[in-house]
Amino acid sequence: MLATGALSLVGKRAISTSVCLRGGHGVAKVEEYTLPAYFDRRENPLPDICYVQALSPEQQSLKEKEKGSWAALSNEEKIALYRISFKQSFAEMNKGSSEWKSVVGGMLFFIGFTGLVVLWQRKYVYGAVPHTFDPEYKAKELQRMLDMRINPVEGFSAHWDYENKQWKK
């Protein structure tokens, strides 16, 4: 008795949820976004549903012809049957798109715009280059470091010949 009740409950639930959902006050239909969707992908060559859901009368007669011998079908009918089930063929899926051109164009545009912003900042935002970047100042700084004998063991002053006043060879 308990098993019969459980089976009838499961059966009622399966029937009621397959077509529509029953709410407290009426019948709620299944929304379209909850149903399986059609996607053409190389990784999943057989989608869950057919591409064309609502068949025209010609397509319905073609589906009836499909149940018979395929030798009786012409090539155009076979292609039409294929297009009912699939939107694209593998050749069409594998065909490259020209989307890369717009991506590269967008990247080059933003790189160019960034370059213009950097040039504008150098001219109008930043001040003059400090005097410490001048080659004359750098030469004086180098001579001062050598005179102070900075890091004489392994570093800078170790490569300077103090007797001949030139770099060691």
UniProtKB/Swiss-Prot annotation:
InterPro entries, per database record: Cyt_c_oxidase_su4, Cyt_c_oxidase_su4_fam, Cyt_c_oxidase_su4_sf
Principal location class: mitochondrion
Transit peptide segment: 1-22
Intracellular or extracellular location(s): Mitochondrion inner membrane
Any one of the GO CC terms: respiratory chain complex IV
Membrane-side (Mitochondrial intermembrane) residue stretches: 125-169
Disulfide bond annotation, renumbered to this chain: none
Gene3D superfamilies associated with the record: Cytochrome c oxidase subunit IV
Biological processes, Gene Ontology terms: mitochondrial electron transport, cytochrome c to oxygen
Keyword Mitochondrion annotated: yes
Keywords on record: Membrane, Mitochondrion, Mitochondrion inner membrane, Transit peptide, Transmembrane, Transmembrane helix
Membrane association type: Single-pass membrane protein
Subunit structure: Component of the cytochrome c oxidase (complex IV, CIV), a multisubunit enzyme composed of 14 subunits. The complex is composed of a catalytic core of 3 subunits MT-CO1, MT-CO2 and MT-CO3, encoded in the mitochondrial DNA, and 11 supernumerary subunits COX4I, COX5A, COX5B, COX6A, COX6B, COX6C, COX7A, COX7B, COX7C, COX8 and NDUFA4, which are encoded in the nuclear genome.
Function: Component of the cytochrome c oxidase, the last enzyme in the mitochondrial electron transport chain which drives oxidative phosphorylation. The respiratory chain contains 3 multisubunit complexes succinate dehydrogenase (complex II, CII), ubiquinol-cytochrome c oxidoreductase (cytochrome b-c1 complex, complex III, CIII) and cytochrome c oxidase (complex IV, CIV), that cooperate to transfer electrons derived from NADH and succinate to molecular oxygen, creating an electrochemical gradient over the inner membrane that drives transmembrane transport and the ATP synthase.
Protein name per UniProt: Cytochrome c oxidase subunit 4 isoform 1, mitochondrial
Organism: Thunnus obesus (Bigeye tuna)
